[in-house]
Amino acid sequence: IYWEVFSRKKDMTKIIAEIGWNHMGNIKLAKKMIREAKKNGADLVKTQIFNTKNLKSGPWDSDGRREIYKKAELNKIKFKQLFNYSKKIKCKFFASAMSVEDAKLIKEINNNIIKIPSMESRNQPLIDYCAKNFKNIIISTGTSTLKEILKSCKNIPKKKLTILHCVSSYPCKFTDTNLPKIDLFKKYFKRV
């Protein structure tokens, strides 16, 4: 598998290293993760931008995760530091946004690419904002039907949009991967 990954054509599959919020707000750790991802062949590195004040209500309110998320927040200064560091080491860097406010912060630093996570894949104000303000939009589809995805993406030019097939159960059993859905997406979307 190692050889297949590193000998692939550059215009084909892209490997995205998901840093997420695993840095827990520690910039030194985040930079190390970016460096290691690049060293190990990632084409892009992705983190998450969110403000716990903007998070919708959910299970994280009752199980203590909201407090953990708070520690992992990246403000504009920290995000810019990571973006500039990534640029310095020639590693493409981008983030997921949970709200329009988060997307605005990302746009101030980098309007080239943004990701919308599965749980926000039906957040029309966020999607419409991104369609107007970003050159490339990646949308995860783990919690949406095809009909919902088509409706959400109707205002995004096809050349800007990449759809990710996602399964929102962790760890995912192979029987739950639903890989044929990728072929279905290819019928409707240019980049899957």
Model-derived features: positions:
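Catalytic cores and adjacent flexible loops of soluble metabolic enzymes
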Residues: I1-V192
